[in-house]
Amino acid sequence: MKNMRLTVCIGIMCGWLAAGMLHAGTRPDHVRPVEEDGSRLWLPVIRPVEGAEVEITYKGKVSPTIAIAIAELKNAWKGDPVLLEKKKTGRGDGFAITSSEHQVRILSSTETGLLYGAYSLLRMQAAGQLTVPLSVTEQPAYDLRILNHWDNPDGTVERGYAGRSLWNWEELPGTLSPRYEAYARANASVGINGTVLNNVNASPQVLTTGSLEKVKALADVFRPYGIKVYLSVNFASPIQLGKLDTADPLDKEVIGWWKQKVKEIYAMIPDFGGFLVKANSEGQPGPCDFGRTHAEGANMLADALKPYGGIVMWRAFVYSPTDSDRAKQAYLEFMPLDGQFHDNVIVQIKNGPIDFQPREPYSPLFTAMKQTSMMVEFQITQEYLGFSNHLAYLAPLWEEFFGEVRPDRLKAVA
């Protein structure tokens, strides 16, 4: 039986944490704040007085990720000297923070974990939660912590109520907005490690060489912050881009087209995460158009990605406008396929059986499918909760979901 995996697709809500910067240890206050416009969220920049810079040490080659961790601490940490050290502290990007009389140590087996530890230390400082001595251990509950953006190539955002897209595709790859690094920084500060850049109602054009060069430019900015990029893809891309007569997932030419396209992507972006697919839903093309199942469509893409370590996130949000009971359709289509999906396929299921309603039970697929890796899709944009006119606190909804879907059956969260 395959392990069930759950990845919660969530977004970051911008806001400010109003908290005074407090001392840790005995180091005097030799820093002054830099003027802020709010874009740095809870992560202020503190300008040290000349000659008063805190000592941050890392034993080893300083990579771009380590350089960021050191810079963040030098910008804002007001306590004792800090030692960053690569050391096994548990699974994945977990980390530990300890302190002795005159030193703070941040330990992790990965460079990204050390960056997370640096942000955790600064967060505790900002919130006034530092203790003496420090003894903090954090392990990621889920390996995949991904944001899904519904951004379109023209700069619009489907179900977007907070302005236009972050990505300026017309200027990429030549011009990199400082907002891209600010985005990566904010995500890394709370442990987000993946982003799907484009709308699930995807245009085949995202897979053209010119578009992939733009995606590469973003991936290069995000990489030092431990963030992989993913793309939503249109299942009929071999027809529109490859000029094939079919997108049948069992057709040899179609299989070859996807393998070649994946090879092209990984030549540009070696750590590319994989594909998100909306198929046979709301008019989007999919394997059912060719008499194939969702599993056959997903597995074909998974086979193309597997040599490079990529995954397929295959959405279970499917319904026919002619059926009067939408709540049952995902179950009826996917439950018979339990156990047929390849290991690097994750079925992405909305938290409820309808469509992001303010109140609805959890999808029965989460407890019914025993042999399939799954991920939950939450909606942060307030499509049903007031658009941009209201601010709704969503954490109780997520907490309720995890109270019903047992955490010990889940593998990942985002």
Question: What do the PLM-derived regions correspond to, one by one?
Answer:
Residues 1-11:
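Bacterial N-terminal signal peptides that target proteins for export
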Residues 69-72, 90-94, 99-276, 306, ...:
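Feature activates predominantly on carbohydrate-active enzymes
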Residues 51-57, 81, 145-147, 193-195, ...:
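Hydrophobic beta-strand segments of well-ordered beta-sheets in folded domains
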Residues 61-64, 106, 204-207, 284-289:
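A generic structural signal for short coil/turn motifs at secondary-structure boundaries
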Residues 25, 77-89, 132-138, 277, ...:
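A generic structural motif
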Residues 24-104, 109-112, 131-133:
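Acidic, contiguous N-terminal accessory segments
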Residues 243-414:
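Catalytic-core regions of glycoside hydrolase
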Residues 9-20:
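Bacterial N-terminal signal peptides
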